[in-house]
Amino acid sequence: GLLQTIKEKLKELATGLVIGVQS
């Protein structure tokens, strides 16, 4: 559903931020 898609996108953004901070 739409909510699941939003959750996945938020997780992708969070992961990207974490990787960006670490590097």
Swiss-Prot record:
Give UniProt keywords alphabetically.
Answer: Amphibian defense peptide, Secreted
Q: What is this protein's function per UniProt?
A: Has no antimicrobial or anticancer activity.
- What organism does the record attribute this protein to? Ranoidea raniformis
Compartmental location: Secreted
Tissue specificity, per the record, is: Expressed by the skin dorsal glands.
Q: Name one GO cellular component term.
A: extracellular region
- Give the coiled coil ranges: none
- Specify the superkingdom: Eukaryota
Name a single GO biological process. Answer: defense response
The answer to whether UniProt assigns keyword Secreted to this entry is yes
Name the protein family.
Belongs to the frog skin active peptide (FSAP) family. Aurein subfamily.
Q: What is this protein called?
A: Aurein-4.4
